[in-house]
């Protein structure tokens, strides 16, 4: 197996999000691409990563290879990764995966391939009443500001805008609309609102580095779905259960 990806920062952003979700994770590396699914211990949130082979600079995977790893160790390993450095993934045996960070200096790490059981994911057929394409940096800032004042993020939407807010001793309210350029597109079925644990959203905020816009979907008292579409066809989907009063 030999894989080359030309910007390690994307993987770094994904691992940062996984670190807050699970202690261990499993990359399912197949000839057609890489997948990963993880569910937090409380079964409140789920992350699904899909990286097709076309998005890699080099991709030679003759047969399926499962790579289990400790998220904290992987995060430390990638901490020093620089802009536009390549990451090279090699494996000559199922026991050890060699990761090379290639830039001004080549740093090589031999990572033990640990046994990680894939999570059992129930079949869900979610229907959303609001589907909005929102500026990623704007959403990042809004979540961060709400996390400073409240433990719950309230989101609502109509045919023209999406509003997120948090209330504690202070109040933060952020509006995304086409007039301000923060809302690229919206699909509207009916006015909807729901509440979510802002800490869970703040934990995966690194994913906003993957794309300029985030697809946000929700409905009354239903899970929220965030979809990050990467260059080359990669996609990271995050589902968060609602906070029920």
Swiss-Prot record:
Keyword field: DNA replication, DNA-binding
InterPro entries: DNA_clamp_sf, Pr_cel_nuc_antig, Pr_cel_nuc_antig_C, Pr_cel_nuc_antig_CS, Pr_cel_nuc_antig_N
Domain of life: Archaea
GO MF terms held by the record: DNA binding; DNA polymerase processivity factor activity
GO biological process: leading strand elongation; regulation of DNA replication
Family: Belongs to the PCNA family.
Function: Sliding clamp subunit that acts as a moving platform for DNA processing. Responsible for tethering the catalytic subunit of DNA polymerase and other proteins to DNA during high-speed replication. The trimeric complex inhibits DNA ligase and both 3'-5' and 5'-3' activity of Hel308 (Hjm) helicase, but stimulates Hjc, the Holliday junction cleavage enzyme.
Self-association and partners: The subunits circularize to form a toroid; DNA passes through its center. Replication factor C (RFC) is required to load the toroid on the DNA. Forms a dimeric complex with PCNA3 and a trimeric complex with PCNA2 and PCNA3; does not form homotrimers.
Protein name stated in the entry: DNA polymerase sliding clamp 1
Gene for this chain: pcn1
């Amino acid at each position: 197996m030999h894989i080359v990806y030309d910007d390690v920062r994307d993987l770094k952003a994904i691992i940062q999000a996984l670190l807050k979700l699970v202690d261990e994770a499993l990359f399912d590396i197949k000839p057609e691409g890489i997948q990963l699914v993880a569910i937090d211990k409380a079964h409140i949130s789920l992350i699904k990563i899909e990286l097709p082979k076309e998005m890699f600079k080099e991709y030679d995977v003759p047969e399926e290879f499962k790579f289990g790893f400790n998220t904290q160790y992987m995060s430390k390993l990638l901490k020093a990764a620089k802009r536009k450095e390549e990451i090279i993934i090699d494996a000559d045996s199922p026991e050890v995966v060699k990761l090379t960070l290639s830039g001004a200096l080549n740093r090589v790490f031999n990572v033990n391939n640990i046994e990680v059981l894939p999570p059992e994911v129930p079949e869900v057929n979610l229907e959303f009443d609001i589907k909005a394409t929102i500026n990623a940096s704007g959403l990042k800032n809004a979540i961060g500001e709400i996390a400073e004042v409240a433990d719950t993020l309230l989101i609502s939407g109509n045919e023209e805008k999406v509003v997120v807010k948090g209330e504690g001793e202070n109040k933060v309210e952020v509006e995304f609309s086409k007039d301000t350029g923060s809302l690229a597109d919206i699909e509207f079925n009916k006015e909807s609102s729901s509440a979510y644990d802002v800490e869970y959203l703040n934990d995966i905020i690194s994913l906003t580095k993957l794309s300029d816009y985030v697809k946000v979907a929700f409905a009354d008292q239903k899970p929220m779905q965030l979809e990050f579409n990467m260059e080359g066809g990669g996609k990271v989907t995050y589902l968060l259960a609602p906070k029920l009063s």
